[in-house]
Amino acid sequence: EWVPIKPKTDAAFLFSLIHVLLHEMPREKLDVPFLKQHTGSPYLIGPNGFYLRDPATKKPLLWDLKRNAAVSFDTPDTDPALDGAFTLDAIEVGADEAMWTHRGITAETAFGKLAARVKPYTPEWAEKTCDVREGTVRRIAAEYVEQAQVGATVVIDGETLPYRPVSIQFGRTVNNGWGAYECCWARTL
C-alpha cells in the first residue's frame, strides 16, 4: 500500500506510529522479552542523558525486578524493568570520558524516556503535519503489530530464529536533506 505523505514529514508519521505502538497497543503485543534481553531499553539513564554505570566495572545498569536492585546489564537471571523510576548510586560516563558520581539518584529506563518522548506525537498531531489521516496511522500500526507475529519462529539452516516478516524500508529521498536525521532515527526504532 502506498501512503501519500507530505514531502519531508516522514518523521512525523513514524513518530506517531511509535506513539501508537507504545501508548495505545497492549504491551503484550510488543516483543517485550526481546526489548528486555537484547536492547538497551532497560538501561538506566542519568541526569546528563548517558547510561548509569556500575562504579567498579563501568557496565551499564538496569533495574532487576527479581532483586529489586540495580545490576549490571549482563547479570544472569534478571527480569529487567522497562518502565519506572528507581533510586540508586551509580556513575555516569559521558563524552570524552567525562564522569559524574551520583548518590541516591532517581533514574528512569531508556524505554521509559522513549515512551515519554513520543507521547505528544499522536496520530491527530501527525495528521496536521504529514496529511495522513489519524485512522490510517492507527490501522497501519495495528497491521504492523499483527504481521510481526511476536513469538513465531522460523528454522534457517537448522537454527530456530524469531520470525520477523515486517520491516520499514528507506526510499532514496527519505535520508536526504532537512528532517533526515529524525526520520532515520524513527525508522530505525
Where are these regions (language model features)?
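Acidic catalytic cores of enzymes that act on phosphate-bearing nucleotides/polynucleotides
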Residues: 138-189
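Long, well-ordered, tryptophan-enriched scaffold segments
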Residues: 2-155
